[in-house]
Structures are given as C-alpha cells and as structure tokens.
UniProtKB/Swiss-Prot annotation:
Compositionally biased spans, kind Polar residues: 1-11
Name recorded for this polypeptide: Large ribosomal subunit protein bL34
Organism name: Xanthomonas campestris pv. campestris (strain ATCC 33913 / DSM 3586 / NCPPB 528 / LMG 568 / P 25)
Any Gene Ontology biological process: translation
Single GO cellular component term: ribosome
Highest taxon of the lineage: Bacteria
C-alpha cells in the first residue's frame, strides 16, 4: 500500500489555522505577530 501525501492544500484551512484573525484571537498568536513585526517580516500571516 502506498503512503499518502500528507500535504493536501486548502486555502480555507490555511487561513483558519494560520491566518491573521486566527493569530489575533489568542494572546500567544498576538505574540507571534509581534515577533514577526519586530523581525521586519513582509508577511505577518498566511
């Protein structure tokens, strides 16, 4: 039996798990955004 590929892309799932509003919803998520702003990331979230 062949092993299935584990990455099954979906823009909706991506946004729900890693999107800006998902990050803003928790204190730790806001810390992630703060870190990425401090680092100077062009894109803060998915």
């Amino acid at each position: 039996m062949a092993t299935k590929r584990t990455f099954q892309p979906s823009n909706l799932k991506r946004a729900r798990d890693h999107g800006f509003r998902a990050r803003m919803a928790t204190a730790d998520g806001r810390k992630i955004l703060a870190r990425r702003r401090a680092k100077g990331r062009k894109r803060l979230s998915a």
